[in-house]
């Protein structure tokens, strides 16, 4: 994904929502860190092993958003990632609605904490509410693209939306 969209650059601040087990955080830290600067903030409800140059915050963004306000103060992020996924129940429509709900919560965090022209990447499941969420992304970003990793099964409804060029003045 980074090869296609050139997302990460040295010195950027990155927020990783739903960071457990830490793959995205580790990759981002390798791309953006210089020296011993902590430029990546990881947030999850599950504890995560320590990663160099990553600050981990344990919280549930659905009901503990004030924790992020306290930790970030007025910090703005260049890149916000959301790989959050609810526990699957096996019903495709319910699972889809639940992940879209997490995407909407993530977008609210983007609106609050993203730097102008920032990037937002979120995992979604294709389905009934996908186009509505895509339109919400288009309202907030100059460009929105779909991305399906090569490693993803062809029959999987899991896909990523990549928002480029956050329109801070829209708010």
From Swiss-Prot:
Reaction equation(s) it catalyzes: uridine(2552) in 23S rRNA + S-adenosyl-L-methionine = 2'-O-methyluridine(2552) in 23S rRNA + S-adenosyl-L-homocysteine + H(+)
Binding site for S-adenosyl-L-methionine: 22, 24, 44, 60, 83
GO-annotated molecular function: rRNA (uridine-2'-O-)-methyltransferase activity
EC number of the protein: 2.1.1.166
Name this protein carries in UniProt: Ribosomal RNA large subunit methyltransferase E
The entry's keywords: Cytoplasm, Methyltransferase, rRNA processing, S-adenosyl-L-methionine, Transferase
Function: Specifically methylates the uridine in position 2552 of 23S rRNA at the 2'-O position of the ribose in the fully assembled 50S ribosomal subunit.
Pfam families documented for this protein: FtsJ
């Amino acid at each position: 994904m980074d090869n296609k969209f050139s997302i990460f650059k040295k010195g950027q601040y990155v927020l990783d929502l739903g960071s457990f087990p830490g793959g995205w955080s580790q990759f981002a830290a390798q791309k953006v860190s210089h020296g011993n600067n902590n430029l990546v903030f990881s947030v999850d409800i599950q504890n995560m092993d320590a990663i160099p140059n990553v600050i981990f915050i344990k919280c549930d963004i659905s009901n503990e958003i004030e924790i992020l306000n306290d930790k970030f103060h007025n910090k703005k992020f260049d890149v916000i990632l959301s790989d959050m996924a609810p526990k699957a129940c096996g019903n495709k429509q319910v699972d889809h609605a639940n992940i879209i709900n997490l995407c909407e919560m993530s977008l609210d965090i983007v609106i609050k904490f993203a730097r102008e022209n920032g990037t937002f990447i979120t995992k979604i499941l294709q389905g009934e509410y996908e186009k509505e969420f895509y339109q919400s992304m288009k309202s907030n970003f100059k460009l929105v693209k779909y991305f399906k990793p090569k490693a993803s099964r062809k029959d999987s409804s899991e896909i990523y939306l990549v928002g480029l060029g956050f329109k801070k003045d829209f708010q």
